[in-house]
Amino acid sequence: MSPQTETKASVGFKAGVKDYKLTYYTPDYETKDTDILAAFRVTPQPGVPPXXXXXXXXXESSTGTWTTVWTDGXTSLDRXXXXXXXXXXVPGEENQYIAYVAYPLDLFEEGSVTNMFTSIVGNVFGFKALRALRLEDLRIPPAYSKTFLGPPHGIQVERDKLNKYGRPLLGCTIKPKLGLSAKNYGRAVYECLRGGLDFTKDDENVNSQPFMRWRXXFLFCAEALYKAQAETGEIKGHYLNATAGTCEEMIKRAVFARELGVPIVMHDYLTGGFTANTSLAHYCRDNGLLLHIHRAMHAVIDRQKNHGXXFRVXXKALRMSGGDHIXXGTVVGKLEGDRESTLGFVDLLRDDYIEKDRSRGIFFTQDWVSMPGVIPVASGGIHVWHMPALTEIFGDDAVLQFGGGTLGHPWGNAPGAVANRVALEACVQARNEGRDLAVEGNEIIREASKWS
């Protein structure tokens, strides 16, 4: 082998493996308005320079492969390569970097969250050069978000359908989540709605098990719903879980729900998958059903601080795929979630335009243009004494879900529901009068409970 070839090989190739940095690390790249931008938290293996690790992430999630192939010459790679625009060290963390990657819009299929994720978080998370990798945030440009229909209805249309304004909505997950017969399940639904809640909810595990088949559950819940509506004069809903083993079965359940005339169905969007979720969202939009989204399995993806994908990414994807409600953490209950980043999720779900704010974990300014908002649902270990805090944290456009907080009431389900409704109305009224809920909250609830 001539010495000339040897030197050439050592520049660009090591045993056939490309030095990704040459093609993909472009610190002088100016991002375009149509690029999808990603912020990755990269933890390189010892000895791997950050720039190389960042470029590896960019390469594997776009056009790269481990060697040079002759078909590269048959296309214009520069047009379609993702570019790692910048890598900045994370303050206070050793060996962690935030890598910013820009993806040209042409890399993605329109209207497909599935394709977007397959590209951006597909193979790259198993990469040898990285000890850990976390997708912290995505900026979805209007040019791409406009190819999605988004939520079937959105916040305003939901309020109009339910005729409920000026306060958060109240929900309750029926417990025990598994084991009740359809008749007893329907009875619990009726008692909660009759007591004053707006919604009750199937737990995410309730699909169609031997002790309660889905059709039986749907029928008893619809009966409970109509009875409670007739007695209270308010519109009521029960999230009927349409999640099933196949897309066809799921749509069949949604059709049955529509035939019963109920207002809302539910889907587990991470276990069910984005493709199924988008299909169901389109069906709900066409047929006037609201769609509640449960995020079962999210902690598998977002719990690790240095690996996985942050929940704000999964939430943005849901807003594009379609859903009218999604559980977004509580700040005060039994599940993990700090106040600032939870409020960040909530704004990304509800607002039209969200400014970049690193203190809340928002890496990019996100402009949703006119895509409808998603109502965040606070659920998980909250009870009536959390009401002042919840009213203050979430504001009016939220659903507050008390499972054990309703059904665990010593006097029974209906009084539990009454307690929640009374506390909510008292807190909203006090807030509107300008009282400080953080200071006087418990006193306000005690006062209200005297007369209810």
Curated annotation (Swiss-Prot):
PANTHER family: RIBULOSE BISPHOSPHATE CARBOXYLASE (PTHR42704), RIBULOSE BISPHOSPHATE CARBOXYLASE LARGE CHAIN (PTHR42704:SF15). Pfam families: RuBisCO_large, RuBisCO_large_N. Belongs to the RuBisCO large chain family. Type I subfamily. This is Ribulose bisphosphate carboxylase large chain. Its main location: plastid. Its cofactor is Mg(2+). GO terms for cellular component: chloroplast. The active site is at 175 (proton acceptor), 294 (proton acceptor). The lineage of its organism: Eukaryota, Viridiplantae, Streptophyta, Embryophyta, Tracheophyta. The modification N6-carboxylysine is found at residue 201. The record marks 334 as: Transition state stabilizer. It catalyses: 2 (2R)-3-phosphoglycerate + 2 H(+) = D-ribulose 1,5-bisphosphate + CO2 + H2O; D-ribulose 1,5-bisphosphate + O2 = 2-phosphoglycolate + (2R)-3-phosphoglycerate + 2 H(+). The basic functional RuBisCO is composed of a large chain homodimer in a 'head-to-tail' conformation. In form I RuBisCO this homodimer is arranged in a barrel-like tetramer with the small subunits forming a tetrameric 'cap' on each end of the 'barrel'. One of its GO terms (biological process) is reductive pentose-phosphate cycle. Binds 1 Mg(2+) ion per subunit. Substrate binds at residues 123, 173, 177, 295, 327, 379. It comes from Salvadora persica (Toothbrush tree). RuBisCO catalyzes two reactions: the carboxylation of D-ribulose 1,5-bisphosphate, the primary event in carbon dioxide fixation, as well as the oxidative fragmentation of the pentose substrate in the photorespiration process. Both reactions occur simultaneously and in competition at the same active site. Mg(2+) binds at residues 201, 203-204. GO terms for molecular function: magnesium ion binding; monooxygenase activity; ribulose-bisphosphate carboxylase activity. It is an enzyme of class 4 (lyase). The modification N6,N6,N6-trimethyllysine is found at residue 14. The disulfide bond which can form in the large chain dimeric partners within the hexadecamer appears to be associated with oxidative stress and protein turnover. The keyword Signal does not apply. Its EC number is 4.1.1.39. It is found in: Plastid, Chloroplast.
